[in-house]
Amino acid sequence: MLQFSESPILGIPGTGPAAVGLMFNGALAGLLDARPDCTDFLSIIPERFWQDFGRSQRPRFAPLPDETALLDRLAERHRLVAHGVGLSIASGSTFDLDHVRQLAEWHRRYDFAWISEHLSAVRVRTEETPDHHAGLALPLAWDHDLLDLVSERVARTQDILGTRLLLENGVVHTPVPGSDMSEQDFVNALVRRTGCGVLLDLHNLLVNAINLGFDAGRWIDGLDLAAVVEMHVAGGNRLFGVYLDSHAGACPQSVWDLLARTAPRCSNLAGVTFEYHESYHPALGEDGVLDQLDRMRQALVPEVVHVDR
């Protein structure tokens, strides 16, 4: 049976309070140097540490020297988890097994506590190119054909990685026609078929609830919460009447409310990760990052007061 890597920091999912982590960005370097103990783990985006020369090239991938040296230094002091952005596991026309093998190679190198990706499509077939990168995660219609497709790909991915894959719920700004089941029913069926885990992004869910007009709490009630291994929390902002998943600094109160309501119900929750875009670091500041970590700990273990500044 596929297992997570055991960690002296994170332990085994479901055996104690969830760990508190940060999505790494360059603006965090100073804080992590001064306070390496402020976070239990770091989540990294592997694709930002290597160069992809394209499917026709051999060798196709090469580590970026400066970025990889930084990652090696981070790995000396922090437990790492991987959060991929390029797999495009739900693309109907293409599936990139070389990308999976590259991720597996990095898993062997860094022994990620777990690996996650997005339940989405970023690559599509167009008239101009059979493998066009859309530049953003595209929304999906939840149907049985897609379930069959993604189930097969998740199984192959987990076999190559040698570990369980977590899949993250995405962002939708407008209704998507063509579904014959709910997103939660789709995810629950995928978990049953493949044994994969769930990365529940609470801010993504809030974005969808605001823009599409549904109740986020009721949405969560329909999800198999025993499959949730990681959660993401983040902030956003409004633009032209639409609420965006912009990772714009501190989390809104609605995200904290969802975390406090949901985390105790997730029996296998291993970690909660705060993510923000580094362009918002001047406004958030290091104290702001520490405050977000404090609030995460308070939500997970209410008797925790704060992290010393």
Label the predicted regions:
Residues L2-T94, R101-E105:
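N-terminal pre-domain/capping segments
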Residues L28, P46-W50, D66-T68, G86-S88, ...:
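Active-site-proximal loop/turn and secondary-structure-junction residues that shape catalytic pockets
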